[in-house]
């Protein structure tokens, strides 16, 4: 949250999606305590307006307003295409072996999303992880099948490159490790 607020002059409204808000949800198999709550957002917003979801461990170096104002071209979702995502065995040795829409950051047109997400009640009772069912329902890992539903946002909004800091190690002694911080160049 700090990095979002630090890098904007715009009003930001934040709703933390805490497990206590969803006490009846089946959460077996989730990767995090909040994995599938993100799909409740359109209904939580009354299927009106836009919403922006980010995982809580995201660090932002740019004003999120630039992402917020992204034109979704009439589509319900904006996401990054993760071309490195390894898919399950049924896609091995096919063009879909890698690649998936990444929901770590999503821009959502809540009204248009209504027909593509199940109700909160249905999601709460979902057997398995709703995330994977949702992603397959919108076309992942078949990118071309989902072009009418997902606007691809700039991959830099979900970057894992780690280029902002260098850690030169001079010794094997942990007490002697030097960490150098370099000024960030203008991002984008």
Question: What does each model-found stretch correspond to?
Answer:
Residues 37-85, 107-110, 115:
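GT-A fold catalytic core of metal-dependent nucleotide-sugar glycosyltransferases
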Residues 1-37, 44-48:
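N-terminal anchoring/stem segment of glycosyltransferases
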Residues 20-25, 85-86, 158-162:
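A short acidic, often aromatic-flanked loop/helix-cap motif at beta-alpha or helix-coil junctions
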Residues 71, 98-100, 172-173:
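Extracellular/periplasmic catalytic domains that process cell-envelope and extracellular macromolecules
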Residues 8-10, 15-18, 108-188:
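A glycosyltransferase accessory/donor-loop signature
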Residues 76-92, 96-100:
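Class I SAM-dependent methyltransferase SAM-binding "motif I" and its flanking Rossmann-like core
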Residues 99-103, 146:
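Short gly/pro-enriched beta-turn/loop segments at secondary-structure junctions
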Residues 28-33, 91-95, 167-171:
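Short, surface-exposed amphipathic charged segments that create phosphate/polyanion-binding patches used
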